[in-house]
Amino acid sequence: MTKRYWNIDLEEMMRAGVHFGHGTRKWNPRMAPYISAKRKGIHIINLTRTARFLSEACDLVFDAASRGKQFLIVGTKNKAADLVSRAAIRARCHYVNKKWLGGMLTNWSTTEKRLHKFRDLRTEQKTEGFNRLPKRDAAVLKRQLSRLETYLGGIKYMTGLPDIVIILDQQEEYTALRECITLGIPTISLIDTNCNPDLADISIPANDDAIASIRFILNKLVFAICEGRSSYIQNS
């Protein structure tokens, strides 16, 4: 994998609060190599390590995108939902930003059926098929469509399992991470000081609570994906 320069600036990371971990009582000892200090009762993340692993992750997604691979971004915290959808759409990635439905990947055949149902209902709505139904039946189908849009809207164009999954909060998205591990899907995960750094293929130590920190990491990854996609288009 070719190493590239991604302009990952330590001062910019500090301004985004990437270095702020959790309280010192709420930590995973396996995170010790990624912690540089304790300050006012919280752990401080070593940003040199963050920059190294973020750079590795950018190299990985660039290479994958330049070969036409598919990505799934998972971040279901309410405050990050809009950020996730905007970033994913910009990089033409699939995303889950509301709730991870158990078995979404490990029970892919069921997910496919839901996606087919979702597409059928969207077609019905666009062709005004609901207007030809009794009001009660139309209301039931509209509720179904609304629910499917909420939970599957970000993966509506997904036709198979993703090649790489980006997870923005290891603890919040633990079910998604376990499904990826079960299926052998490579993962990139943000890890705060209360996380296990050994679960993902590339773990990026960072504050996973502050929106500015999440935005900084995600923007770097999305930029690398977009650059890789441009390379793929030029070479195809």
UniProtKB/Swiss-Prot annotation:
GO molecular function terms attached to this record: mRNA binding; structural constituent of ribosome
Keywords: Chloroplast, Plastid, Ribonucleoprotein, Ribosomal protein
UniProt-listed Gene3D superfamilies: Glucose-6-phosphate isomerase like protein, domain 1 (3.40.50.10490), Helix hairpin bin (1.10.287.610)
Any single Pfam family the record assigns to this protein: Ribosomal_S2
InterPro entries cross-referenced by the UniProt entry: Ribosomal_uS2 (IPR001865), Ribosomal_uS2_bac/mit/plastid (IPR005706), Ribosomal_uS2_CS (IPR018130), Ribosomal_uS2_flav_dom_sf (IPR023591)
Alphabetical GO biological process terms: translation
Major localization listed first in the record, in broad terms: plastid
Location within or outside the cell: Plastid, Chloroplast
GO CC annotation terms, alphabetical: chloroplast; chloroplast stroma; plastid; small ribosomal subunit
Similarity section: Belongs to the universal ribosomal protein uS2 family.
HAMAP family: Ribosomal_uS2_B
The protein, known as: Small ribosomal subunit protein uS2c
Organism this protein belongs to: Arabidopsis thaliana (Mouse-ear cress)
Taxonomic path: Eukaryota, Viridiplantae, Streptophyta, Embryophyta, Tracheophyta
UniProt gene name: rps2
